[in-house]
Amino acid sequence: MFLAQEIIRKKRDGHALSDEEIRFFINGIRDNTISEGQIAALAMTIFFHDMTMPERVSLTMAMRDSGTVLDWKSLNLNGPIVDKHSTGGVGDVTSLMLGPMVAACGGYVPMISGRGLGHTGGTLDKLEAIPGFDIFPDDNRFREIIQDVGVAIIGQTSSLAPADKRFYATRDITATVDSIPLITGSILAKKLAEGLDALVMDVKVGSGAFMPTYELSKALAEAIVGVANGAGVRTTALLTDMNQVLASSAGNAVEVREAVQFLTGEYRNPRLFDVTMALCVEMLISGQLAKDDAEARAKLQAVLDNGKAAEVFGRMVAAQKGPSDFVENYDKYLPTAMLSKAVYADTEGFISAMDTRALGMAVVSMGGGRRQASDTIDYSVGFTDMARLGDSIDGQRPLAVIHAKDEASWQEAAKAVKAAIILDDKAPASTPSVYRRITE
């Protein structure tokens, strides 16, 4: 039997906690036998003293085990259970293509996603732009969809990693969110509860990233890869660029539209293509569906070219109570904004920098995201035809097309877009979409 205050004291004094001590504390968070003050105190001691790798693995596993851990063995699936997690960005719609692409190549993707957080868009919010789409199927239905379709994208239920929910809520109000061991535990507890064979992490870098510097993004990626592999799940991470909006659009319905166009081949933004393919390649290799990069890319390109990936997306939408002809008739179903018109720069030049975070917040301000949990989302608003770094901007090439609910909202968004995009008289050096791959 342990005492919570003695565990806090031990960590406060700079000592490593045992697996048993960590499990006792996490189970107490779940069972409400540990107070909010005690959670806050432990979070702050971890913030200042960090955690060893064994402590990090124990924390993650204890949070994972605080609720249900999905088990797929009884379904006798003929492929690996794989997923990816992104630290979030703007125009980051990769999940909507990646899940169907990997499923079309023989993987099973039980993706448990989140809502928008701060300036970042949420996969669940995007999917809810599709009429009828059900993000909370019951457990049996979720398993059926995975078995029949190969991919489902759902919201986190209360049975998955419940200790994390309470731990995170306390961290959020005690300035202890940005601790690498605590971020790692929070992300992986939910992902590992999916019962995965393999995981790829997409850790964003740049002005729209969660972590403020490249070094911190790299440290987070290394921590997640180390802990997940320590927990027995084959995991790699990619550091990808978020110094500009990833897709050509940012919003909810507008990003779903771009995802369908990507899958059908109607339009593929080159940077979005690079990042999506790179993440899918990691999933196929880690899931042992391909032996190397070349084989993985060939398989993925084939399911895009032969329409199989688009077909899987359509089947997922239908299985989750969306329209059965969504891929063929997406424009009929997706909401459109009252006002859509282009915004132009006041001067000419090349785009040298972009405050991606500010662009994400502009979408939120238009109603495309939540400032508080009770807010309702306007799925129709957002940006399309986003200009990219290095683009030559003049009276012919707009910075973006803004989709707004009225003129006043459009004007406010136009001001934000102009302020967020910096022009220079010469083009900047091009930056890669994927900076590096982390395997340990």
Swiss-Prot record:
Its family remark reads: Belongs to the thymidine/pyrimidine-nucleoside phosphorylase family.
User: Its pathway?
Assistant: Pyrimidine metabolism; dTMP biosynthesis via salvage pathway; dTMP from thymine: step 1/2
What HAMAP family does the record tag this protein with? Thymid_phosp
Keyword DNA-binding belongs to the record: no
Which keywords does UniProt give here? Glycosyltransferase, Transferase
- What is the designated name of this protein? Thymidine phosphorylase
Looking at the record's lineage, which domain of life comes first? Bacteria
Q: Which organism is it from?
A: Salmonella heidelberg (strain SL476)
Could you give a GO molecular-function term held by this entry?
A: thymidine phosphorylase activity
EC number(s) per UniProt?
Answer: 2.4.2.4
Gene for this chain: deoA
**Function (record text):** The enzymes which catalyze the reversible phosphorolysis of pyrimidine nucleosides are involved in the degradation of these compounds and in their utilization as carbon and energy sources, or in the rescue of pyrimidine bases for nucleotide synthesis.
**InterPro entries from the UniProt entry:** Glycosyl_Trfase_fam3, Glycosyl_Trfase_fam3_N_dom, Glycosyl_Trfase_fam3_N_dom_sf, Nuc_phospho_transferase, PYNP-like_C_sf, PYNP_C, Pyrmidine_PPas_bac/euk, Pyrmidine_PPase_CS
Question: Is Glycosyltransferase one of the keywords?
Answer: yes
What are its GO biological-process terms? pyrimidine nucleobase metabolic process; thymidine metabolic process
Quaternary structure and interacting proteins, as annotated: Homodimer.
| Catalysed transformations (reactions) | thymidine + phosphate = 2-deoxy-alpha-D-ribose 1-phosphate + thymine
Q: Which GO terms describe its cellular component?
A: cytosol
